[in-house]
Amino acid sequence: DRTGLEREIPGLGPEWSTGLLFEQDGQIDNRRQLMRALERACVSLGVRFMEGAEVLDLERESAGELCGIHLRSAEGEQQQLRCQQAVLCSGAWSQQLVPQLPVFPVKGQMLSLQGPREALKRVIFGPGTYLVPREDGLIVVGATSERDAGFAEGLTPDGQKQLQAGIASLLPTAATWPPMERWWGFRPCTPDEGPLLGPGPLPGLWLACGHHRNGVLLAAITAELTAGGVMKKAPNAAEEALLGAFRWNRFEN
């Protein structure tokens, strides 16, 4: 009820009278902390990063199997890397390498505000807008969902107005807090908004794409299923069911 809402979220907009409380709901700073931690962990295990490189094409044997990738380095040099297996995790751009994959971009705009420390202790999900608090008082505000924008870059007045309206509705006091950043990105979406996992249309190619808004949430199980496939580990019944449910060609009649 309203009393409970005010206890959990002081300053909540007056139009809200009921809500659902998820005690175990949380958040992580994926842009700054999570990705840096993952990079350090990968480097410690011997993973080599080629920053700024672009994969131009997948190399195939005469029988159609994957045999390598053709890429361009950050310095503009083209080269081939030989491999028998590869994982496609190119997000919204996955279809550029494998045209038959049903992955398309959904643009999202976001912004952040600097509020007082601990001004908001709960993540708030409203219709079309959410507020995510960080430890230092930073509030991340998201996000638009623009299915017709394609890969159009940049912020838009309509998108920013939507976010500002959401702030005013959910936490009116935050509307006066100074903005810190504004940015946009492209979610990798599929027709049913579920990911594409498991073997791809090219023998030797494994898929880990199309996660839409749930990339971080599904990262662990995606990694487990993908690593198992690459290592030729036989899936158990539960894993086999997941791989079947999220196969890339499930939309075909």
Located regions from the model:
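Flavin (FAD/FMN) cofactor-binding and adjacent substrate-gating region
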Residues: D1-L45, M50-E51, D57-E65, C189
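C-terminal catalytic lobe of FAD-dependent flavoproteins
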Residues: R31, T173-N253
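Short glycine-/acidic-enriched loop or helix-start segments at secondary-structure transitions
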Residues: R60, L97-P99, G150-A152, L217-L218
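A short alpha-helix-loop-beta-strand transition element characteristic
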Residues: D1-E6, V103, V123, K233-A241
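Flavin (primarily FAD) cofactor-binding/catalytic cores of flavoenzymes
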Residues: D25, R32-S44, G52-V55, I69-E75, ...
